[in-house]
Swiss-Prot record:
Subcellular location: Cytoplasm
GO CC, alphabetical: cytoplasm
Protein name: Phosphoribosyl-AMP cyclohydrolase
GO-annotated biological processes: L-histidine biosynthetic process
The organism of origin for this protein: Zymomonas mobilis subsp. mobilis (strain ATCC 31821 / ZM4 / CP4)
NCBIfam families: PRK00051.1
């Protein structure tokens, strides 16, 4: 049986018990997976209004706009939501590296045989 949450046109994010939703960011031009973060209602609304990715920092317990210190903002081109409305997909144009380490993507290491292997920058 179809329901509005899965099939309807009403935006109704399924916030978790902490009031958060997972956001996956990819490069709008290349499709590269850049990072995963979390949004609360306020950061989601700010992201939609400003077209710049803004999140809830679970460690610092505050709103943060990606790149507010480094200048490496993420310009939102498109926001999608999954069928359960519990995960967001932001297609962005990155204004610099996505990772705080300076890597283009936060996913710059492979897990092999229980160890981490750094992927060369030209292979990320």
């Amino acid at each position: 049986m179809q329901n509005d949450q899965d099939y309807g046109n009403k935006l109704n994010p399924a916030w978790d018990e902490k009031g958060l939703i997972t956001a996956v960011l990819t490069d709008a031009k290349t499709g590269l997976l850049l990072m995963v973060a979390h949004m609360n209602k306020e950061s989601f609304e700010l992201s939609m209004a400003t077209k710049e990715a803004t999140f809830w920092s679970r460690s610092r317990k505050k709103i943060w706009r990606k790149g507010e210190e480094s200048g490496h903002v993420m310009k939102i081109q498109e926001i999608r939501i999954d069928c359960d409305q519990d995960t967001l997909w932001l297609k962005v144009i990155p204004m610099g590296p996505a990772c705080h380490t300076g890597a283009q993507s936060c996913f710059y290491r492979l897990v092999e045989d229980g160890h981490l292997v750094t992927i060369p920058k030209d292979k990320i």
